[in-house]
C-alpha cells in the first residue's frame, strides 16, 4: 500500500519511512505500558482488554488519514492500540507451557503473527482489484475483530495468573532489577539488533518489490498489487521460519539457533538490494528466504528472556525490551528511507538494504557473549 499512498500524498521516501516508523513508535509505547499491566492484573485479562482497542484503531486511519501528518499520527495511534496483545501472549505461554516445549510454542505464536500479516497483505492485494487503497485498508481493518473473538474462545478455560512480588517490593522496583540482570539485558540487546533488521525488512519489502516490478515494465497500479501478493507470499515463509526456529531452539539450543539464523539474514541484508534486476521469480525466492531467516530466531529471543528473569517481573522485562527493541525498529525504516533518498536510483536499494545489515551486525556478537555466559 505504501507506493500508492506515497504517490497520492506526494511523499518522499524519508516521509514514507517516518509513517512506517510511527506505527512502531506507538507499538513500543504500548508494549512498555502493557508489560506493567500484565504483571499487575494478569496476562489473560490484559490480552483480552487491550484487544478491544486493537479492533477499533485501524478505522481511524482508514477514515481520517489524508496526508503526511495525519497519516503519521493515526498510524502511531494504530500501533499504540495494536501492541497491547503481544506481551501478554508471551507471558501466557511462559505461564502455561513447560520449558521443553516453550521454544516451539513461542515459534507458533510468532508464526501466527506472520500468518496474520500475510493474510492482511493478501486481503489488501485482492481488494485493490476492486477498490482504491482506502477501501483495501478498510477490508484489512475488519480482520482484528475476528482475531479478538477467536482469542476469547481459545482462552475461555485458561486461568488468569498474577505472580506475587516479594513483600514490600513495588512494581517499579522491577525496572532496576531487570537492568542488573546481565543475561536478561544481553537478550534484550540481541533482540534490539534483530528488530532493527526485521522491522526495516517488513516496512520496505513491498516497496522494493514494487520497484522491481516497475523496472520489469509493470504499470504502477499493477506493480503495487503484484508486490503485495509477492510480499504476502514471502511473509508466509515467516510462518515456517518461526516454527522451524522455535523447534531448533528446543532441540539444539537457544543461542545456537539465534547465531545460525542471524548470520543468514545478515548475508541477505547486505546482498538483496544489489540484486533488484534479477528475474522476478528468483528475487521473490530470495525475499522468502530473507523473511524465513529474519524471523527464525525471533521467538527464541523471547524464550531466552523469559528464562532469564523471575516470573513476577517478566512483563516489565518485556516492557524494557519493547522500548529498546522496537525503538530500533522505529529508527531503521527512517534510516533506510534516508539512505534511499540520498543514493537515488541505481545503487540506492543496495545501500538502503545494507543499512539494515549494519545495524544488525552487532547481534551475533551479543548472542555469542550470551552463549559463553551460559556454558
Which residue stretches match the model-derived regions?
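Multi-pass alpha-helical transporter architecture, strongest
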Residues: 149-154, 354-375
Amino acid at each position: 500500500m505504501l507506493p500508492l499512498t506515497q504517490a497520492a500524498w506526494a511523499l518522499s521516501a524519508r516521509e514514507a519511512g517516518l509513517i512506517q516508523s510511527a506505527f512502531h513508535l506507538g507499538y513500543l509505547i504500548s508494549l512498555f505500558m502493557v508489560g506493567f499491566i500484565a504483571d499487575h492484573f494478569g496476562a489473560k485479562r490484559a490480552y483480552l482488554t487491550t484487544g478491544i482497542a486493537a479492533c477499533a484503531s485501524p478505522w481511524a486511519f482508514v477514515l481520517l488519514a489524508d496526508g503526511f501528518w495525519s497519516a503519521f499520527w493515526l498510524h502511531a495511534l494504530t500501533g499504540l492500540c495494536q501492541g497491547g496483545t503481544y506481551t501478554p501472549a508471551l507471558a501466557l505461554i511462559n505461564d502455561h507451557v513447560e520449558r521443553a516445549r516453550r521454544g516451539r510454542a513461542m515459534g507458533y505464536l510468532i508464526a501466527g503473527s506472520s500468518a496474520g500479516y500475510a493474510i492482511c497483505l493478501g486481503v489488501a492485494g485482492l481488494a485493490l482489484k476492486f477498490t482504491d487503497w482506502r477501501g483495501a485498508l478498510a477490508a484489512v481493518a475488519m480482520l482484528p475483530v475476528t482475531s479478538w473473538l477467536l482469542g476469547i474462545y481459545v482462552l475461555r478455560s485458561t486461568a488468569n495468573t498474577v505472580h506475587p512480588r516479594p513483600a514490600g517490593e513495588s512494581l517499579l522496583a522491577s525496572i532496576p532489577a531487570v537492568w542488573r540482570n546481565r543475561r536478561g539485558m544481553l537478550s534484550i540487546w540481541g533482540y534490539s539488533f534483530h528488530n532493527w533488521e526485521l522491522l526495516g525488512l517488513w516496512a520496505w519489502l513491498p516497496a522494493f518489490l514494487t520497484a522491481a516490478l516497475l523496472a520489469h515494465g509493470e504499470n504502477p497500479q499493477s506493480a503495487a498489487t503484484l508486490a503485495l501478493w509477492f510480499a504476502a507470499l514471502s511473509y508466509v515463509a515467516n510462518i515456517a521460519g518461526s516454527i522451524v526456529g522455535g523447534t531448533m531452539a528446543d532441540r539444539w539450543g537457544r543461542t545456537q539457533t539465534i547465531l545460525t539464523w542471524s548470520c543468514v539474514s545478515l548475508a541477505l541484508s547486505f546482498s538483496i538490494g544489489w540484486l533488484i534486476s534479477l528475474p522476478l521469480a528468483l528475487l521473490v525466492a530470495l525475499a522468502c528466504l530473507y523473511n524465513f531467516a529474519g524471523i527464525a530466531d525471533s521467538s527464541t529471543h523471547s524464550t531466552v528472556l523469559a528464562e532469564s528473569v523471575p516470573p513476577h517481573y517478566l512483563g516489565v522485562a518485556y516492557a524494557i525490551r519493547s522500548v529498546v527493541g522496537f525503538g530500533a525498529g522505529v529508527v531503521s525504516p527512517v534510516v533506510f528511507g534516508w539512505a534511499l533518498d540520498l543514493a537515488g536510483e541505481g545503487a540506492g536499494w543496495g545501500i538502503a538494504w545494507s543499512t539494515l545489515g549494519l545495524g544488525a551486525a552487532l547481534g551475533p556478537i551479543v548472542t555469542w557473549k550470551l552463549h559463553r555466559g551460559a556454558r
